[in-house]
């Protein structure tokens, strides 16, 4: 069974691009445009990984706040933060809040796939 990855980004083109890359590699993806949609998806089914944009414009919660909420609900879910506006302080804050890793946009598909594989290693070993 394919690992389930939830992609949370306010930019539809980024969601579609990331989901497409992951689908092509055999992952099962779901997408969410904002925090409430992401929380509904989490409640419906636990993902193997969440790819989460830091800013989430127009959302009730930004990415770091949503990261807090995800970790409150299930600390074992790995979360890979994505940002086009990130800096070292944002990356450090995300890691301190429990993110597995941090990747800046734009990124190469190979780099994304490497980080996804690393973040889901424990989940794969459980199967």
Residue ranges of predicted features:
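Short amphipathic alpha-helix used as the core "switch/output" element in two-component signaling
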Residues: 40, 62-76, 93
């Amino acid at each position: 069974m394919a690992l389930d990855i939830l992609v949370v980004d306010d930019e539809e083109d980024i969601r579609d691009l990331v989901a497409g890359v992951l689908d092509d590699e055999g992952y099962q993806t779901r997408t969410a445009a904002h925090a409430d949609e992401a929380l509904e998806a989490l409640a419906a089914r636990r993902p193997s990984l969440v790819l989460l944009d830091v800013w989430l414009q127009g959302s009730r919660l930004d990415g770091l706040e949503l990261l807090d909420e995800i970790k409150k609900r299930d600390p074992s879910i790995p979360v890979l933060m994505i940002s086009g506006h990130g800096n070292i302080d944002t990356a450090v804050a995300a890691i301190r809040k429990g993110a597995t890793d941090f990747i800046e946009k734009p990124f190469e598909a190979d780099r994304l796939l490497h980080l996804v594989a690393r973040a889901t290693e424990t989940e794969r070993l459980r199967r």
